[in-house]
Amino acid sequence: MRALLSVSDKEGIVEFGKELENLGFEILSTGGTFKLLKENGIKVIEVSDFTKSPELFEGRVKTLHPKIHGGILHKRSDENHIKQAKENEILGIDLVCVNLYPFKKTTIMSDDFDEIIENIDIGGPAMIRSAAKNYKDVMVLCDPLDYEKVIETLKKGQNDENFRLNLMIKAYEHTANYDAYIANYMNERFNGGFGASKFIVGQKVFDTKYGENPHQKGALYEFDAFFSANFKALKGEASFNNLTDINAALNLASSFDKAPAIAIVKHGNPCGFAIKENLVQSYIHALKCDSVSAYGGVVAINGTLDEALANKINEIYVEVIIAANVDEKALAVFEGKKRIKIFTQESPFLIRSFDKYDFKHIDGGFVYQNSDEVGEDELKNAKLMSQREASKEELKDLEIAMKIAAFTKSNNVVYVKNGAMVAIGMGMTSRIDAAKAAIAKAKEMGLDLQGCVLASEAFFPFRDSIDEASKVGVKAIVEPGGSIRDDEVVKAADEYGMALYFTGVRHFLH
């Protein structure tokens, strides 16, 4: 038996090589892997000695040789292949262990294009693909996490075709991921990220019980190990719908730096939000906005879930809590609640991934765009359109309202008072209907909107929403502007003594 080991990530390769040697494998290797194995007392043959061909062009050509690829690719059960192998002095290679030049890491560490180009692996993917193609005869490894499993399988004599088939699938996933990143990087560097092709590659984290509905399959995939590093289940398992709501709640609650923010989300839209002096008070005021919709919702906590906050949340049924951190006493509060699910990022404050791009599936393809973000100075740079200026406290509330609006399905309007959302209308086909729905819900909840501020993610097409806002005592408004009737909206704000700001930035969300 013969194995070829050539890896960039050398974690565990010495131990793996020793185990293979003990199992009777002859070992071939290249470059740094060869040196490391030899230094650790493993009998190893350098590929250039095996092929009788030196490495060429500063190592660009090492394993691209018939004795390597012929040794991997020839079928052991095909008499003609066996004959050709003997005639050409090609010896079988039964195990290929390769991982690739660190192209992605290089692009993160350096902007030197020559260095980046040199870290595009050629021979590695070729060997992986060859071994994967001939999986019926050859084992292929590209992940150090598989070393132990492979050794155990070999020792037990369970190296069957089905085992190798699973390694083959993983190998093609690995090379596809590698090539996709290279293509995306080149398009990002030279075509602004919008080239002729776009590759979206994620790594599976776990299967969900089902998809959005019970008859659909579902799973969570991640970019750059984000969930593996920042998502830990303390109680229960996340469903497909939980994950989309967690995403919405986390994005909103984490948008205010280290502020003690609480966001409550249901079906992707906020039904409660507040920033008060502490997390308990933030939760109390967030819940007031719409305690009915909060039932069975997702609560995101930008800080630590402690016992006091846990007891307060436990007064009603929420399905999911996502907190930056959770202490043991808080977890004990929910011990008797079977249905609640609790997740943490094990961090002082909530962490967002800040993905650079966003995409949505449409039948026949997908649409792709830069991710939307509310700029740090968006409100600061907004243009005052009215005669009246907002007070310092009103400006704080306007910033909160503006960010909530950006994370809420269009059309929406958001009313905020003293750091807490007091009314919201969202997902409406008419902005005036959103305004009326928000006010009606606030009245139902017994909330006083007098002195609140108002934000809209897109312009007001008519003055009717301003007229409606005046009836409940709105004092300041922020919106993008851009309507052909902006003058009417400004005039209405002045009539009612409101402060009105145009940001010039729309935040549609569909």
From Swiss-Prot:
Keywords: Hydrolase, Multifunctional enzyme, Purine biosynthesis, Transferase. GO terms for cellular component: cytosol. It catalyses: (6R)-10-formyltetrahydrofolate + 5-amino-1-(5-phospho-beta-D-ribosyl)imidazole-4-carboxamide = 5-formamido-1-(5-phospho-D-ribosyl)imidazole-4-carboxamide + (6S)-5,6,7,8-tetrahydrofolate; IMP + H2O = 5-formamido-1-(5-phospho-D-ribosyl)imidazole-4-carboxamide. SUPFAM superfamilies: Cytidine deaminase-like, Methylglyoxal synthase-like. The IMP cyclohydrolase activity resides in the N-terminal region. The keyword Cell cycle does not apply. GO terms for biological process: 'de novo' IMP biosynthetic process. Its EC number is 2.1.2.3, 3.5.4.10. CDD domains: IMPCH (cd01421). Pathway: Purine metabolism; IMP biosynthesis via de novo pathway; 5-formamido-1-(5-phospho-D-ribosyl)imidazole-4-carboxamide from 5-amino-1-(5-phospho-D-ribosyl)imidazole-4-carboxamide (10-formyl THF route): step 1/1; Purine metabolism; IMP biosynthesis via de novo pathway; IMP from 5-formamido-1-(5-phospho-D-ribosyl)imidazole-4-carboxamide: step 1/1. This is Bifunctional purine biosynthesis protein PurH. InterPro entries: AICAR_Tfase_dup_dom_sf (IPR024051), Cytidine_deaminase-like (IPR016193), MGS-like_dom (IPR011607), MGS-like_dom_sf (IPR036914), PurH-like (IPR002695). It comes from Campylobacter jejuni subsp. jejuni serotype O:2 (strain ATCC 700819 / NCTC 11168). GO terms for molecular function: IMP cyclohydrolase activity; phosphoribosylaminoimidazolecarboxamide formyltransferase activity. The gene is purH. Residues 1-142 form the MGS-like domain. Belongs to the PurH family.
